[in-house]
Structures are given as structure tokens and as C-alpha cells.
Amino acid sequence: MSKELKLFRNFGIMAHIDAGKTTTSERILYHTGKNHKIGETHDGAATMDWMAQEKERGITITSAATYAKWKGHSLNLIDTPGHVDFTVEVERSLRVLDGAVAVLDGQNGVEPQTETVWRQATKYNVPRIVFVNKMDKTGADFYYSIETMKNRLGVKATAIQIPIGAEADFVGSIDLIEMKAYIYDGKADEEYKIEDIPADYLTKAQVMRSQMIDDVAVFDDEVMEKYLSGEELSHEDIKKCIRKGVISTELYPVLCGTAFKNKGVKKLLDAVVDFLPSPIDVPPIKGVDDHGNPIEYHNDPNEPFAALAFKVATDPFVGRLTYIRVYSGKLDKGTYIYNATKDKKERISRLVKMHSNNRDEIDSISAGDICAVIGLKDTTTGDTICDEKKPVILEQMVFAEPVISLSVEPKTKADQEKMSLALSKLAEEDPTFRTYTNEETGQTIIAGMGELHLDVLVDRMRREFNVQVNVGAPQVSYRETFTEVADAEGKYIKQSGGRGQYGHVWIKFEPNHDKGFEFVDNIVGGKVPKEYIKEVENGLIEALTSGPIAGYQTIDVKATIFDGSYHDVDSSGMAYKIAASLAFKEAAKVCKPVLLEPIMSVDVTTPDDYFGTVMGDISKRRGVIEGQEQRGNAQAIKAKVPLSEMFGYATDLRSNTQGRGQYIMQFSHYAQAPKSVTEEVMVARAKK
């Protein structure tokens, strides 16, 4: 089986928006024989962009999985979104993949979202190769793209191909391993001629090959010895070194082409097979057993079954689909599994391999593979499913909290019931989507990562669930926190005939910067019985959902229960829960709570002519400029700007740059809001 696993490649395609990820994926499907016709993103016909919203907008919204064969290897491919609002799709895909292809726009090189997805891949130690796409584009520069990798990503980027021609004259590439020229005919089948290197490229190719060998030889001692002794390295020597460097995540080989014009994708597929790891090349997955002890699982079908659920989707024909990556053991359809995260047993009805939104039934799946499961009702993203006799919880995923919200109101009574179902289904699918009811107004609030994110979700409610809703204006999701330390008492006593209620606590509250809510039990001598401590914590968690300033969630607070008392008859869990919330309210009077506003990382690209206007506009929005650099005939500006100041920015940027400016925005952190903003928020809240 290890021999078979060696032939697996689980990889994703990741990039900045519009770099050509999906077009590259479509060419891969065509060349591997998975598709018999090429689907184009701009025609709304891409296989991997199957959602109606994706076809209309020409962007990828949800990660799409497929599988194919190439030169005797089994490929599991996931095409991920490039827009920051859907970064959760990239995060959960990279968590379960063994490798990735980073696609760069040949004109722009590393762009802001490239940096984001690169960081995500680094977080999960995902080996990568790089495809510089759109080499036929005006202004395309392969060597500039490599420099941006070195300067902006700080990585060892090594060309293993160089282009022949550029822009409209791009005709092929030189393979620096083989020292041969590949000249493409540009037709769908991507036929090419292998020729000697043109004379006017020979010197450049020799210099670049020498640089490549310098970069890669260090990854194998035997090869390094041959190289230093002046021996000629074989093609296999070089490939072995590149593979080792890639798997160590210390080397990033760079290829070039233009997927849309059918140049370079077959060589990219060769590189996926040659250089990206198989499941047995990556480190074992870590987790904890049912006693909390660390445990490792290897990609071995003979070990106990363990898999991670990384995505949940709703299929109109089969219902709930749960995507899993199997790390060890084997799973058969019709069997029972144990959800160690939820402590529940569930039955696997069917197993399917996904091709975008199409399903191919399979009977079983083994370690190292990816599939979707039908029949799991309680398993959600990040859950571990395993053998009940050998329980394990694998390393879990952590997702960003929503920063923007809006109200949704059903248009009719019939829509009310359908809306509740739609929201619960969408929340199951998307860990960065939240829905709740505003207790003061009774409104249903939905929260997400950005305006586009919420716009797509509302559109899905209307189309997929036939729910008609009125939508409110986007609102900022503020937070609150404490800035000083205080001890607070919470005492709840109620006597109304029969058994009373008694709960009494003393809790120390203190700021807990960037560490979330932390609860500490410092009770000694049984002053508060152990069985009520959890209820104290639960009472605080509930109280934190509505802060003292404007009713926003209170975050980054440490609460230590250190004293209290109890009554033999009247004490109850509910009484201590209420006492804890009373202590929180008392603390809020003296801990000097402040309002926190979300601060966004904003990357703006503008032509030189409009640079001053754009900079001035950012400053007006309370933005802090962090850096700028020249990119061709444009300026790239990095800034931190409060989210509340960014509504309507797309329209203003278009106006200020004659439609030529672009920007990308993502959440950075929460920071204390100025007094004027706090007062505005309090006034607005009071009017509701």
C-alpha cells in the first residue's frame, strides 16, 4: 500500500484573485482527461466554478474538489478562492493538503492576497511550487515575479524554467534541468516541440541553470559532493534535490506559462508529480487520545481509522456532504464511525469522490485520500472522526471571527420558517458565518468576513432556499473589553416559599490582551462547591455576549473566582450562573470598559497620477500608512484603516482613479476606538 500511496498527490491551487487559478485548474482537468472540453471562467463555463454566483461574478467562492490521473499518479485537486472574503475556504483546504501550486500573475508577481494565502500555507507547513501565469500579458516579467517572491515573501525562489519571449511573443520555455526548449503550438491539446535552446537564449539559460544548481544541490549530501568535485549532475540528481528542498519547505521552484493560451500546464503537471510530496512524505498528523496524551498517526491504511472533516456542503440531491481527509486506516460505506470531537457515533451511508459538484460512488477509502461522506448529521468542520476503540482528536482548525454584520428580515410569514432553516444550513457550511437574534430589537443578524461574503450568502438564501428577505445596511461588529483590574461580588438570593435560590461569588476581572476569555478556578476549602464552578463559567460566558457600553461582545478578559459561599439546601447551578453575571455587571462599573473597533489591512494599487489623491483619502479615513512601493507604472500602498471608515470605499477609489485603482481588504486586529466613535456608537445603540 505504501507503494500505492507514493503515487498520490493531494494538492491545491492558490493565488491572488484573477491570477488564473481556475483557468489553470480547468487546463489540468482537460489534459488529464477528466474533462473533454475546456471550461472558461469568463464564459461562466468553468467546471470548478459551479455555483450560480461564481458563474455570474467570474470568481471562485467555494473551494471545489476533483480527482484525476497523470502519468500513473492519482491527483486530488482543490481549487480555492482568491478573494479575501472567502479565505476560510483556503484555510480549511490547506489544512488537509500535502502540497500546493501558487499561481502568480506574470505582470504583477506577488500581490496582497498572494501574501495572505502564502502565510496560510506556511502555517500548515505546506510544500509549494510556483507557476508564473499570463506570460503573454502586456508587461509580463518572469524575473520580476521571482524578485517579488524573494522580497515580499522572503523565500528561496528558484527558476527551473525560463521563458522564451514575453508578452505577445511568448512561445515557450527552457527547461533548465534538461536544457531543452519547449515550443508550444498554443492549441487546446498543448502540443509542443522539444528543440535545442535558441542561440540568443543560451548564455542566459546557462547562467540560470548554474544558479538553480547552486540553490538545489545543498539538499542532498551525495549530490553536493559530486557538484563540489566538478562532476556533471544528472537530471535525476537535480530532480531529487528539488524534491527534497520542496518537501522541506525551504525551496520553491518556479515555472512559467500561460494557462489560457495552453502553454506550460503539462510541464506544471509533471512538476506536481516530480516535486510535490505524497502522503507518506509528509510528517505524521498529531492529536490527543481520550486521556489527553499526545499521539501521532501515520498515513498508513493498517493503523486505526482517523480522518478530519474539513468542509460541509449542502447538495440539493443528497443533502449534507461532509468532506474528509483520511490520515490513517480505512473506511467502508455502511459502517459506523465515532466523532471524537462531539462524542457521538454516526453511520456512513455512502462515500463519494467529488468532481466539482458531481459525485462518483466508491465503496471504501484509505489513508492518504480525500472524499465526501453522505449520512453524517452532527459532524462539522474541524471534527475528528475515528475508530471508537482508538479515539483521537486531531489538531483542530481556528477560523477568523466575523467583522461585519447586517440585519435580515423575512418578507412573509412563510419566509420566516424557511429563513431559519437556510441560515442554519449556511452556518453549518461556513465557520466564518454567524447568525443570531438581537435581543433588544428582535432582528435576525448575520455576520461575516466582508460585504461580498454577506452579499453572496443572502443571494444563496434567495436562490437555493427560496427565501425572500429585506436586508439592512452593513454594520461594524464592534467589541468591548476591560482596561483595569477589579474584584467584584455577585450574590443571588431568592426566597419565595419552598426551596429558595442561593449563589454567591467573588471574581477578579482583569484585561487579557489578545488572549480571549480565560476562566480560572482559585477556590480553596470548598467555599463554592466544585459542581457549581462550571455554571459560574457559563454565566460569565453568557454575560460577556452583551457588554456594558453598547451591548457588544466583551473580549480579552480574564476572570478568576477566588471566594464565595453556598447554602446546603438553596444553592443551585442556576443561582451561581446568575451570581456570576451579577459580578460581571459590578466589575463593568469599575474596570473602565472601552469600545474596540475592527482595524483592516488595506492594500491599494493606484496609477502614479492619482497617488496623492488616494493617500489623502486614506488619511481622511483615519488610516495609518505602513508602506508604499513602486510596481511598474503604479504605486502600491499598505495601510491600516478602521472598518467603519471603509464603507463606500470601492466607489470613491473608482472615482479618484478614473476606475483604474484596485484594493484588497482583510481583518487585522481590534483596537480601542476614539472617544468620538464610542459616543456615536452609544447614541446609535440607544436609538434602537
Swiss-Prot record:
InterPro entries: EFG_II, EFG_III, EFG_III/V, EFG_IV, EFG_V, EFG_V-like, EFTu-like_2, G_TR_CS. The gene is fusA. The lineage of its organism: Bacteria, Bacillati, Mycoplasmatota, Mycoplasmoidales, Mycoplasmoidaceae. Residues 6-280 form the tr-type G domain. NCBIfam families: EF-G, PRK12740.1-5, small_GTP. One of its GO terms (cellular component) is cytoplasm. Catalyzes the GTP-dependent ribosomal translocation step during translation elongation. During this step, the ribosome changes from the pre-translocational (PRE) to the post-translocational (POST) state as the newly formed A-site-bound peptidyl-tRNA and P-site-bound deacylated tRNA move to the P and E sites, respectively. Catalyzes the coordinated movement of the two tRNA molecules, the mRNA and conformational changes in the ribosome. Keywords: Cytoplasm, Elongation factor, GTP-binding, Nucleotide-binding, Protein biosynthesis. It is found in: Cytoplasm. This is Elongation factor G. GTP binds at residues 15-22, 79-83, 133-136.
